[in-house]
From Swiss-Prot:
This is Lamin-B1. GO terms for cellular component: lamin filament; nuclear envelope; nuclear inner membrane; nuclear lamina; nuclear matrix; nuclear periphery; nucleoplasm; nucleus. Residues 431-547 form the LTD domain. The modification N6-acetyllysine is found at K112, K158, K272, K331, K484. The modification Omega-N-methylarginine is found at R15, R414. Keywords: Acetylation, Coiled coil, Disulfide bond, Glycoprotein, Intermediate filament, Isopeptide bond, Lipoprotein, Methylation, Nucleus, Phosphoprotein, Prenylation, Ubl conjugation. Residues 391-410 have a biased composition (Low complexity).
Length: 588
């Protein structure tokens, strides 16, 4: 054991204080047996005390468990009553919603009748407007004839002004070319001086290099003379001859290069000087001809100015007549615009009323669906806790909610609890959503969000599908919008791509998630249809979603069908139910 008992400490002290006297083997064996028996008795006493304390603690824990189970039972009973109350309130709200929906449908029929009457009135006003537009076109034809005459006069004026501007531009160009020629002559003079300086510097450099080469030759010759001391006289003469021949060839090469460079400089200088002289002569002759043309242009401008004054008088008369016609046309346009704005305002008011009724209807439908889902979630949570606590289940009722034509199952597990299989069957006695889809190619339309947030496509084949030039068209009633894929986009085999609206709150993650920045929503309505066309304009897939609304004649008893809700133990305990503790003690 970890600690020694007081009896053991006392015996150890007595053994330490005993005199060291010799004992017989029998005495020693008896003492050892006696000591072992005492130790075993001490250990047994400690063990009995430990067992008693554990039994006491176990009884206290069992009492706590019993009390907590009683508290949990009371809380569960209260929570069940609270859920039943909320369920009854939700059912009453659902009934009120159904009645309100029927009223709204009746009002919608009235508004449709009023809308048809307004359409008839609008057609009559359209015929009146077409007559006014015919008169307007007649006035515009007369105005166009006058505009043509005025445009002819203005065109002649502009052509004369253009000729004058062309002559001025030619004079400016000639003066600019003359100044450029003078500048070129100065540049050529400077270039000549620069080339002469460069020739002088190159000559000096050549002289310097020649001196350096001679020094190097002398140095090389001295080195060879020192090396040729050990060589016989025949070999020495041969080396000197080769060295002299090599030096002679180097001198000839350098002289030839210097001569070529001098000849090139002289040829370049003479050619540029001749070009400058010819350019100066040409510029002088051009300036003289330009002066003659300028004199002729001045005389022509004077004659054209007199003609222009006459045309301006005629133009002023035409402008006065045009002003009168424009005033008459403005009055007619104001009257037509006023009538058209009145019709548009009436149509806008009718559209706003219809849109308000539709939005109210959609809000009521969303409230109903949310209530149904919440009721199912509460009931499923309650049944899960009853099953976990092994309580008798309450009588179930059935509530149906329609969100899509498909069904799905959700499985949740927690520790060693029993797995709960929840199946969502989506149908409604009052509102139902039906889907229909077809595809003739590798790509199909997998899903259309009923809230207008996204449309999802899927490549069902084992090959990549290029989507360049493909178009996806969404139709709701008479309105339609289209989305085109980029030329480089490719949908991988077995992959899905989701095209999100701009207000969906999703960030782009190509190639699986794309954002349509120009469209805030794909749109919602009772009849939504999406068509997918390839780059040749052929329809390869389509999917439609139709909302069917019926008014129930009488309310029947409904059975509960749980919607996919994950039953989590932590959420239940946050609402006030304590956790059960299961502890046991093992006595070794």
């Amino acid at each position: 054991m970890a600690t020694a008992t007081p009896v053991q400490q006392q015996r150890a002290g007595s053994r330490a204080s005993a005199p060291a006297t010799p004992l017989s083997p029998t005495r020693l064996s008896r003492l050892q047996e006696k000591e072992e028996l005492r130790e075993l008795n001490d250990r047994l006493a400690v063990y009995i005390d430990k067992v008693r304390s554990l039994e006491t603690e176990n009884s206290a824990l069992q009492l706590q468990v019993t009390e907590r189970e009683e508290v949990r039972g009371r809380e569960l009973t209260g929570l069940k009553a609270l859920y039943e109350t909320e369920l009854a309130d939700a059912r009453r709200a659902l009934d009120d919603t159904a009645r309100e929906r029927a009223k709204l449908q009746i009002e919608l029929g009235k508004f449709k009748a009023e809308h048809d009457q307004l359409l008839l009135n609008y057609a009559k006003k359209e015929s009146d407007l077409s007559g006014a537009q015919i008169k307007l076109r007649e006035y515009e034809a007369a105005l166009n004839s006058k505009d043509a005459a005025l445009a002819t006069a203005l065109g002649d004026k502009k052509s004369l002004e253009g000729d004058l501007e062309d002559l001025k531009d030619q004079i400016a160009q000639l003066e600019a070319s003359l100044s450029a020629a003078k500048k070129q002559l100065a540049d050529e003079t400077l270039l000549k001086v620069d080339l002469e300086n460069r020739c002088q510097s190159l000559t000096e450099d050549l002289e310097f290099r020649k001196n350096m080469y001679e020094e190097e030759i002398n140095e090389t010759r001295r080195k060879h003379e020192t090396r040729l001391v050990e060589v016989d006289s025949g070999r020495q003469i041969e080396y000197e001859y080769k060295l002299a021949q090599a030096l002679h060839e180097m001198r000839e090469q350098h002289d030839a290069q210097v001569r070529l460079y001098k000849e090139e400089l002289e040829q370049t200088y003479h050619a540029k000087l001749e070009n400058a002289r010819l350019s100066s002569e040409m510029n002088t002759s051009t300036v003289n001809s330009a002066r003659e043309e300028l004199m002729e242009s001045r005389m022509r401008i004077e004659s054209l100015s007199s003609q222009l004054s006459n045309l301006q008088k005629e133009s002023r008369a035409c402008l006065e007549r045009i002003q009168e016609l424009e005033d008459m046309l403005a009055k007619e346009r104001d009257n037509s615009r006023r009538m058209l704005s009145d019709r548009e305002r009436e149509m806008a008011e009718i559209r706003d009323q219809m849109q308000q009724q539709l939005s109210d209807y959609e809000q009521l439908l969303d409230v109903k669906l949310a209530l149904d889902m919440e009721i199912s979630a509460y009931r499923k949570l309650l049944e899960g806790e009853e099953e976990r606590l092994k309580l008798s289940p309450s009588p179930s009722s059935r509530v149906t909610v329609s969100r899509a034509s498909s069904s799905r199952s959700v499985r949740t597990t927690r520790g060693k609890r029993k797995r709960v299989d929840v199946e969502e069957s989506e149908a409604s006695s009052s509102v139902s959503i039906s889907h229909s889809a077809s595809a003739t190619g590798n790509v199909c339309i997998e899903e259309i969000d009923v809230d207008g947030k996204f449309i999802r496509l899927k490549n069902t084949s084992e090959q990549d599908q290029p989507m360049g030039g493909w178009e996806m068209i969404r139709k709701i009633g008479d309105t339609s919008v289209s989305y085109k894929y980029t030329s480089r986009y490719v949908l991988k085999a077995g992959q899905t791509v989701t095209v999100w609206a701009a207000n969906a709150g999703v960030t782009a993650s190509p190639p699986t998630d794309l954002i349509w920045k120009n469209q805030n929503s794909w749109g919602t309505g009772e009849d939504v249809k999406v068509i997918l066309k390839n780059s040749q304009g052929e329809e390869v897939a389509q999917r439609s979603t139709v909302f069917k609304t019926t008014i129930p004649e009488e309310e029947e008893e409904e059975e509960e069908e749980p919607i996919g809700v994950a039953v989590e133990e932590e959420r239940f305990h946050q609402q006030g139910a304590p956790r059960a503790s299961n502890k046991s003690c093992a006595i070794m």
